[in-house]
């Protein structure tokens, strides 16, 4: 088989195969990359069978990143910390190495957007510059797990506040990161945001709300003209979350297409030991949306 694939549900909308093809063309290789629709009952079987039949590498997307974590024989440090896997490589001895490139892909996109300065601090037009950079993270699933560790280690002045529709999941995630040494992280029941007096420099939607045609229920007053609003999801037009943020005064908004390409580039690096060019692929996908 000697192929690559992405596993998820839904999967029809995925741009991963197109991204891989563009990267592969750049460095002059030719490999198959397929979309694999799975459900919870057959994900483990499909993944193992893919590698048994000669698969070399796989991307894992929602909702299977946490499942994949437990199926790998070895884990990179960032996958271990995230307890979530979005990239798997079959090693020469036949074992599976799990990695999580979501976090590094997210940080690379913040830099591409010029939202981070040379010291990896979020750029602010406010004066004075806040001593603590407050980040609101909406969601506590696999996508959120992938970005928390690198946010805390890269943006050294940040404090992350996690909210989630099911508060117990936010508590579990917060407790885990506190136990492994990250102190600048807390959580809050979603309804208590109406009493929150923090000024957030960055608000991240790490939920799948757009798939369900909804937006996270957060108060409009958390949005200021200087707030950076990022939706890990991406669509042809603005996501519902970004539309809502703009309506409430946000001047800095981005969807997750740049992060998608960034994390895919780091997956490609793991598989082929070559780092592809990111920006032309983002530009190509953006233009293709409107053709």
From Swiss-Prot:
One of its GO terms (molecular function) is NADP binding. Pfam families: Shikimate_DH (PF01488), Shikimate_dh_N (PF08501). Pathway: Metabolic intermediate biosynthesis; chorismate biosynthesis; chorismate from D-erythrose 4-phosphate and phosphoenolpyruvate: step 4/7. It comes from the Bacteria. GO terms for biological process: amino acid biosynthetic process; aromatic amino acid family biosynthetic process; chorismate biosynthetic process; shikimate metabolic process. NADP(+) binds at residues 77, 139-143, 164-169, 232, 256. One of its GO terms (cellular component) is cytosol. Shikimate binds at residues 14-16, 61, 86, 102, 234. It is an enzyme of class 1 (oxidoreductase). Keywords: Amino-acid biosynthesis, Aromatic amino acid biosynthesis, NADP, Oxidoreductase. The active site is at residue 65. It catalyses: shikimate + NADP(+) = 3-dehydroshikimate + NADPH + H(+). Homodimer. Involved in the biosynthesis of the chorismate, which leads to the biosynthesis of aromatic amino acids. Catalyzes the reversible NADPH linked reduction of 3-dehydroshikimate (DHSA) to yield shikimate (SA). This is Shikimate dehydrogenase (NADP(+)).
């Amino acid at each position: 088989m000697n192929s690559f694939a992405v596993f998820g549900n839904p999967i029809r909308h995925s741009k991963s195969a197109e991204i891989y093809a563009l990267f592969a063309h750049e460095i002059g290789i030719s490999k198959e990359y397929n979309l694999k629709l799975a459900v919870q009952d057959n994900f483990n079987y499909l993944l193992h069978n893919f590698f048994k039949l000669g698969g070399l590498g796989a991307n894992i997307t929602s909702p299977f990143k946490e499942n994949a974590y437990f199926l790998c024989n070895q884990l990179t440090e960032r996958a271990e910390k995230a307890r979530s896997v979005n990239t798997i490589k079959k090693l020469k001895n036949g074992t599976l190495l799990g990695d999580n490139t979501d976090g590094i892909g997210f940080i690379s996109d913040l830099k591409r957007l010029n939202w981070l300065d040379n010291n990896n601090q979020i750029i602010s037009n406010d004066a004075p510059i806040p001593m603590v950079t407050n980040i609101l993270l909406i969601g506590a699933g696999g996508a959120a797990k992938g970005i928390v560790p690198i946010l805390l280690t890269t943006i050294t002045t940040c404090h992350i506040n996690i909210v989630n529709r099911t508060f117990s999941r936010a508590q579990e995630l917060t407790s885990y990161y506190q136990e492994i040494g990250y102190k600048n992280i807390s959580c809050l029941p979603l309804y208590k945001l109406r009493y929150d007096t923090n000024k957030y420099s960055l608000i991240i939607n790490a939920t799948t709300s757009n798939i369900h045609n909804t937006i996270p229920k957060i108060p409009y007053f958390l949005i200021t003209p200087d707030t950076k609003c990022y939706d890990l999801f991406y669509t042809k037009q603005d996501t519902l979350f970004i539309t809502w943020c703009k309506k409430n005064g946000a001047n800095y908004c981005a969807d997750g297409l740049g992060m998608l390409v960034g994390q895919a580039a780091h997956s490609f690096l793991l598989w082929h030991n070559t780092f592809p060019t990111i920006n032309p692929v983002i530009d190509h996908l953006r233009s293709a949306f409107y053709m």
